[in-house]
Structure formats: C-alpha cells, structure tokens
Amino acid sequence: MKKISLLLAALLVLTVALCACGSDTTSSASSETSSAVSSEVSPEAFSEVSSEVSSEAASEVSSEASTSETAAGGYGEFTTIEEGKLIMATNAQFPPYELVSDGEGFNGTGFEGIDVEIASAIADKLGLELQIDDMDFDSALVAVQNDAADVVLAGLSYSEERDEVLDFTDSYATGVQVVIVKEGSDVTMDNLGEKMIGTQRGTTGYIYASDTPENGGYGEDHVSAYDNGATAVQALVNGQVDAVIIDEAPAKEFVAANEGLTILPGNWVEEKYCAAVNEGNTALQNAINTALNELMDDGTVQEILDKYITAE
C-alpha cells in the first residue's frame, strides 16, 4: 500500500510539472505543490518504487508466459525435484518390468523393461530427461515420500496402506501374483498357511501374506521377507522357504532360469500396476496421469507390454 501511495505521489509530481509548463497563472501554485510533493517523495524513493514496480510487472508477465507455455502442452503447471529431469525410483530386479541392462540400456538409461520404457515415454511427453535410481523396493517408496525421487515405477500395485502416503496414477497393467514351488513339492494353494513363504519385502505379496489369518493372510511367523525377488527365489532353491509368492511375469523368468522350479496352478491374487508420486503432489500426479493415458490411448503402452510379455 505504501508503494502504491509513493507511486501515485510521484506521478502527481510529473502531472503538476507538465501543467506548470502549460500555464503561467498556475505556475506559482504548481511550484508550491510540486515542492510539497517532492519533499514527500525523494528521488531515491521514486527510483525504488519505479524499479520495484517494473520488476514485479516483468515477473508477472514472465510467470504468465511460462504458465501459458506449459498449459499449451496439456499437462498443466508442475515442478520436479531437479529442473528438466524426471527422477524415477525403482528396484531393477523385477524382470520384465525393470532390470539392469548388460549394455547402455533403453535410451542410454542403463536399464530396460516395461516400466523403464513407459517412464521414458512419459518423460518425453513432459519434455523431461528420465533419470533412473535403482534401490531396494522399500527404499524406492521412501525416496518418493522424502522427495528424493519424483515418481516410483517398480511393478507397483495399489493398496489402501500405500495410498495413505502416495498418490497413484491410473493403472497401466494387470499384475497377477502366483506361487513358485519346487517340482514334486507337496505345497498347494490350500496348505500355504502351513508352510514357510518367501516374498519380496514391502510388496503387496508380503503385506497380504503376513497379515493375520482373520484377514486372509498366514501370519508373520509364516513369511520371510527378502530385499528382492531373486533373493527370495534363491532361498527357495536353497530350501530355506517352501514357496515364493511373486508376480507372474517375473515368476516365469525365475522358473526358466532355475531348473527344478514350477508355478502352482491358479492365481494367488490379481491387482493393478500404477505409478505413484508423493502424497499431495497433485500437479505432478495429474501431468504424469495425462501423459500415461495418452500413451494407453495411442497403443504405446500395449506395444511395450507385448514386447516383453508374450501371450500364451
């Protein structure tokens, strides 16, 4: 308010001065008025107000131009942790969704898989460079919650527990969890609760299996958690657990790579895969969701899924 008053006073000085130049009869009054106003508005104050108003106006114009440019892309106004980048947290031991590449990986990321290619396509639409940070599954969820990563894609399925700390996108794939056992084992879907089960720590497989029998689980005493699916499967091979609950796509990869393992008939549970951002980051959630839906509508997501998962 003070700045506005000073600016008006400064403009009054100019007006009075111009009037004084155009009329001799008012020159005396104009001189007195100009002197009085000038005593209130020093050159320094006038300069400061003019400078600040110009700066604010320029900033406002710049902001409006930036917003307009972003909105033109159809993704709204959003920010990421590092300007120009989309940082994705994942656990790259979950084939075919994410795995470490032997070479440069997809688009030079060092990684490959369904989630890697989908995230790369999303980043392209948002005009960002994709950076992938590999870590344990639990750590990937925490990284997003602590703003160390923008988004998590890691064969991540929705759960009410996760929804309390993360904001999810729409689902882009269906995940079916199955049970891996040794060939000739007496383990069945019906007697799983009597066996020792291996799971990947932090996954819905672990959450559901370790829940109480009243809630459909087997209890924590019947579940061993491992940092990743590969370690859980190795525990099965070594006889440390009787079965492993894991998603169907990686289960097939692990069974193919380990002789003597098989998948029990039937599905243990079916769920949807999503991406997720930190709770409350609605702008980024909407931007990613919009890009993701465009990729589903134009068939890109299905092409990526078909590339890695062959229908039987």
Question: Which residue ranges define each predicted feature?
Answer:
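A ligand-binding cleft/hinge motif common to bilobed small-molecule-binding domains
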Residues: S139, L156-E164, Y208-D211, A235-E270
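Bilobed "Venus flytrap"/periplasmic-binding protein-like clamshell domains
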Residues: M88, F94-P95, T109-D124, L156, ...
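Extended ligand-binding regions for polar small-molecule ligands
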Residues: V116-K125, S185, N191-T204, A275-E312
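Acidic, polar ligand-binding/catalytic clefts
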Residues: S120, E129-L192, T262, N267
